[in-house]
Amino acid sequence: MTTGFLQKIFGSRNQRLVKQYQKTVATINALETQIEKLTDDQLRGKTDEFRQRVAAGESLDKLLPEAFAVCREASRRVLKMRHFDVQMIGGMVLHYGKIAEMRTGEGKTLVATLPVYLNALAGRGVHVVTVNDYLAQRDAEWMARLYNFLGLSVGINLSGMEHDQKQQAYAADITYGTNNEFGFDYLRDNMVYETDARVQRALNFAVVDEVDSILIDEARTPLIISGQAEDHTELYVRMNALPPLLERQIGEEKADGTGVEKPGDYTLDEKARQVFLTESGHEKAERLLAEWGLIGEGESLYAPQNITLMHHVYAALRAHTLFHKDQHYVVQNGEVVIVDEFTGRLMAGRRWSDGLHQAVEAKEHVKIQSENQTLASITFQNYFRMYAKLAGMTGTADTEAYEFNEIYGLETVVIPTNRPPKRIDKQDQIYKTAKERYDAVIRDIRDCYERGQPVLVGTTSIENSELLSHLLKQVGLPHEVLNAKQHEREAAIVAEAGRPKRITIATNMAGRGTDIVLGGNAEKQAAFIEADDAIPADEKARRIQKLHDEWETLHEEVKAAGGLHIIGTERHESRRIDNQLRGRAGRQGDPGSSRFYLSLDDPLLRIFAGDRVRSIMDRLKMPEGEAIEAGIVTRSIESAQRKVEARNFDIRKQLLEYDDVSNDQRKVIYQQRNELLEAHDITETITAMRHGVITEVVRQFVPEGSIEEQWDVPELEEALRNDWQLDLAIQEMVNESSSITAEEILDAVMTAADEQYEAKVAMVGRESFSAFERSVMLQTVDRLWREHLAALDHLRQGIHLRGYAQKNPKQEYKREAFELFAAMLDAIKQEVTRIVMNVQIQSPEQLEEAAEQIEERGGHLENVEYQHADYADAGAPVANVTAAAAATATADMVGSAMTHSGPGGEMPKVGRNDPCPCGSGKKYKQCHGKLS
């Protein structure tokens, strides 16, 4: 109450910020007359003037009014678009590293040019991040005209580009690209063998378009570069026969033995998307697997030799019971393609993790592709937090403002609209069954069609969009279907969705990023005419003018009919996605309306609010076909959505807490890798490793400060001979001297090791041997880091069970991950020392050839996939793109094959006396800095 009273007097923080920015807008507007008088060359010359002032120490904040005024004038001349005052406010919000919430149609693409231009003046690079290649290319080509006019270079970073093209794109002042590609480039940069092979510069400033989609919706799905692991294809096929033989149990057994309505072999938890075998289910599965010869007679599924079979049993069960064709995936060209649950788009190339995708392939009887092994991974949360400054824009961020602030430290500012919104959001209508709901939707669509009002119908799955399409065909209503199956036609369909009588069905936010203009998009049609060289210039002008005249008539016709009408066929689990659908109507002050039609069969209502609403309907004795339309029900649904949002936030936060552990370790490894790449000579590092390893070996058989009776000299001699190629007569030394000490034995072994090393260096020269050492070191670090990631995955999967032992799983994970990391560092030292000590050199040429072989293979990777997988639950998508620019290093003389990949950003350095980022409390030099 007090807060509300104070807000009335002083305004909310959002209002105060907007008012503060309006003062700066007044300053910019005052400069407009002066800037308008400049010639094109003088306007372009302002960029060089600004750059010199920045180089001389002037801050970007101080430069902002002039730079924004110049950018606005350039946009007016080149793009024929002048930034509105509210767009200037949006630009300031982005420059100050915040999130700008701007309604659909308010010109977010144009807003981004202001902070991008200003920050590009510093010369450290600016990244503009979009959700797909189409938008990245469209925006880059569109805005490049403005930036090039002002003397700035623009690069586009797309998937599948050549290495040289990527380097050029990142070297530009401004780089447009997708979130996936920026993240994968970072991982690849930290898998290269030469500093010249990197593509990214330091991560300076990023403007993220559709920031909610990238930093919230996709935050649970890490980017993963993986290679093929062991093949279990046949096992998936055999396991696919199991689920149809098992029956679902209805109801959960309570402590008193009641609650089970129908006994069965497994139970489903739809909220958690998990399936569990019951006791009878275990027995039945074991009996069937024994009959098929997959386990021994009378053996348990939990026997050590059968534990991997459990993974396959549950993968097959989940594939059959929780993942459904045309809802969660489609089968296309003999492949299982995931459908994005947020946008309804097909995610070609992405794969589910934990063997789920292979199980679904077995279920659909298509070719089963092999499982993968992680080579490198990072979450978007940790990738984007590495930028020195981060900003974002979207039409719907306010509902997630707390999460943006909590996870990323980003404040959300709601930008006022240029014109007051006129959209009417009607109350939800709730029906008992899906049939009644669809009947009501068809009635509403028919009514709009007869009045000439365009309709956009939002569905949550391909299955629902095709069902609705079938119903519309039955009643003879012409329509367009915009779902993942029509991806190529998406932009064209959306552009025309505002024409009179146009009916468009879209899965969730398909077509996001393209405006729906009332009356249709004349600009797009005009562009086609402009691009047709067969049409004479005067004919082009006549046709384009005719187009614009027709558009004016249609535009007024649609406005008179009420503008675009939005129909939602069910509520999404996130209010934000619902708001995005509504936001397609009422752009730039146009009229519009929206309404959601729900049924008690909808997953959200069934799981979270169904019983309450059903009891209300029963008490009111609602006849068939009658809808509830009441605030209390709408509030009940929004309450259910808030519960789901809170649960999803907890999942993302928990994922981040776990991922922070591996992220800190990743920083250490990548920093040390970069230091290795940049060092001219790593002799000191190799020598320190050798001394440490040899000391450990000797101490194992001749403990420090011990007496002769405690020594095991024959075993020491054998270990040195077999593992380190050191043939020393230590027993003779002991026999000849009655007073020899453990320290003297260590010195003798160390001297022999140093001499052997120096002899190899002398044979080929310091430079050649150092290049070989660097290659070996990088190959070993990468291979053991890859194995460490797999170990962390396994640790993660079972760590929740520690809770049953009254232990904190997060603390246990942190402790054990630290122990695994320390063991990995020791293994790196052991492995590198062993290879360098054992390498047999015949000639300098042979050594150079070996080093080149490692590096060449380190720059090319076969059978590599780029995945966007979900650790949090195996039902999340994994992107797999066969790699052109990733890496394998395999050298017979060095050890087992390792898989690798291209380019990366710079890590913030950790000082040697700073606390170690792993959280152990020790200094970095005494902890994970030991390797350097």
Curated annotation (Swiss-Prot):
Name what cofactor the protein needs: Zn(2+)
Q: Where, by residue number, does Zn(2+) bind? A: 916, 918, 927-928
Kindly state which keywords UniProt assigns to this record, in alphabetical order. ATP-binding, Cell inner membrane, Cell membrane, Cytoplasm, Membrane, Metal-binding, Nucleotide-binding, Protein transport, Translocase, Translocation, Transport, Zinc
| EC number annotated for this UniProt entry | 7.4.2.8
The note on the cofactor says: May bind 1 zinc ion per subunit.
Which GO terms of the cellular component aspect does the record hold? cell envelope Sec protein transport complex; cytosol; plasma membrane
Q: What class of enzyme is it?
A: translocase
Q: Which SUPFAM superfamilies match?
A: Helical scaffold and wing domains of SecA, P-loop containing nucleoside triphosphate hydrolases, Pre-protein crosslinking domain of SecA
Q: What does this protein do?
A: Part of the Sec protein translocase complex. Interacts with the SecYEG preprotein conducting channel. Has a central role in coupling the hydrolysis of ATP to the transfer of proteins into and across the cell membrane, serving both as a receptor for the preprotein-SecB complex and as an ATP-driven molecular motor driving the stepwise translocation of polypeptide chains across the membrane.
Which protein, by its recorded name, is this?
Protein translocase subunit SecA
Origin organism of this chain?
Answer: Burkholderia orbicola (strain AU 1054)
